């Protein structure tokens, strides 16, 4: 396996609270891993560690074979995109300026390259070109979320971290964003880690699903394997909940087509 990310026996403590303990898992390059678990189980902590925002209390995390503790943030961050719920955009910047912010840091002297990159990512996330000069306050929730995703992708990172990025939008927009994200993953081959509270979303999007609980990995498997063979009571509860709803296999998402996403 060509490994993109590896956690080795990680422990993380906040004050007197142990959030992660004996936490082990690895992600292959190009994998789309959805992460699910109860509130406070350490899902966001995992993403923040990969991005260098916080450090483990003990042991090591490897990104592309290198221990992140041996890297400074300027080395680590260009390879990692980060999108969160609500997509915190710069209110005084236009859509184009928001998306190009990271590109401008990398390509300070190549404005034409930056403009081409902005157009490329706007198109890929379903944003109309005419929105370039608008400010965040003039956009719908779905459009703002797309800008946030485009900004996270603008530097062409190898890894995309997403922390409940669709939590603040309506169900129709959420479904459209799910389809777009699957298409982006398919086109770019980027490694994605996607945190969600929704088991249905985790099963639809992920090529693999990481179930967290009590600071440890409860199960790490392909969606179909998770449904067929839940191995703990916690995972069984999640699976039973999903069986009471309608499970949409991720193949359906890849084949779906729709239009007008950039206008919603």
Where are these regions (language model features)?
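A short, proline-enriched helix->beta-strand linker immediately N-terminal to the Walker B motif
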Residues: 154-158
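Conserved ABC ATPase signature
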Residues: 135-139, 143
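ABC ATPase NBD coupling module
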Residues: 67-81, 105, 111, 229-230
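Short helical segment in ABC ATPase nucleotide-binding domains corresponding to the A-loop/adjacent helical element
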Residues: 95-105, 112-115, 119
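Helix-to-loop junction immediately C-terminal to a conserved catalytic motif
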Residues: 51
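Conserved ABC ATPase "signature" region
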Residues: 112-130, 183
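ABC ATPase "signature
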Residues: 220-221, 229
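Conserved ABC ATPase "signature" C-loop
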Residues: 214-215
């Amino acid at each position: 396996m060509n490994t993109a990310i590896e956690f080795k026996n990680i422990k993380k403590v906040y004050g007197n609270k142990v959030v992660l303990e004996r936490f082990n898992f690895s992600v292959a390059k190009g994998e789309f891993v959805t992460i699910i678990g109860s509130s406070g189980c350490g899902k966001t902590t995992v993403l923040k560690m990969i991005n260098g925002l916080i450090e483990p209390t003990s042991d090591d995390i490897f990104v592309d074979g290198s221990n992140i503790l041996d890297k400074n943030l300027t080395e680590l961050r260009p390879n990692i995109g980060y999108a969160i719920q609500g997509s915190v955009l710069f209110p005084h910047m236009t859509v184009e300026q928001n998306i190009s912010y990271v590109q401008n840091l990398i390509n300070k002297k190549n404005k034409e390259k930056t403009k081409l990159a902005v157009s490329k990512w706007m198109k890929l996330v379903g944003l109309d070109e005419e929105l370039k000069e608008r400010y965040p306050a003039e956009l719908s929730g779905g459009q703002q979320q797309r800008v946030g995703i485009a900004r996270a992708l603008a530097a062409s990172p190898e890894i995309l971290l997403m922390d409940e990025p669709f939590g603040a939008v309506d169900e129709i927009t959420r479904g459209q964003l799910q389809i777009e994200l699957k298409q982006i993953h398919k086109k770019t081959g980027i490694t994605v880690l996607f945190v969600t509270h929704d088991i249905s979303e985790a099963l639809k999007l992920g090529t693999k699903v990481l179930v967290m609980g009590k600071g440890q990995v409860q199960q790490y498997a392909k969606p179909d394997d998770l449904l067929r063979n839940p191995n703990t009571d916690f995972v069984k509860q999640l699976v039973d909940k999903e069986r009471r709803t309608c499970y949409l296999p991720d193949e359906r998402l890849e084949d779906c087509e729709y239009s007008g996403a950039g206008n919603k």
